[in-house]
């Protein structure tokens, strides 16, 4: 088994959801996480705040990301899977996919 990173991305201007729709979306996320935990493949994950800072060469710090970008990283999971195809199959259940979100699946290198 190997560890894989799921990076959840979405439009900086997502469709506005009503409070009732947000509750349904959050329940889908919680159900997905619980399913991954029951299968013993969920290792970690958290949503990310919409803004942050970037450290560059010579210790220059810039604000960002900005809404001009195509997509914002909204969160991450670390999961355990036998290979990237199995990890992709897990990612297909992401509740944001039907709303236009994306999931980038990356193999985490062992060091």
What name fits each language-model region?
Residues 1-111:
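Conserved, structured core segments of small domains
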């Amino acid at each position: 088994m190997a560890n894989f990173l799921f990076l959840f991305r979405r439009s900086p201007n997502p469709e506005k959801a009503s409070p009732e729709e947000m509750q349904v979306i959050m329940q889908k996320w919680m159900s997905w996480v619980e399913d991954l935990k029951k299968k013993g493949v969920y290792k970690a994950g958290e949503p990310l705040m919409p803004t942050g800072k970037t450290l560059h060469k010579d210790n220059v710090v810039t604000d960002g990301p900005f809404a001009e970008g195509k997509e914002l990283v909204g969160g991450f999971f670390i999961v355990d899977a036998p290979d990237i195809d199995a990890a992709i199959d897990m990612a297909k259940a992401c509740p944001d996919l039907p709303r236009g979100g994306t999931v980038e699946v990356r193999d985490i290198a062992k060091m």
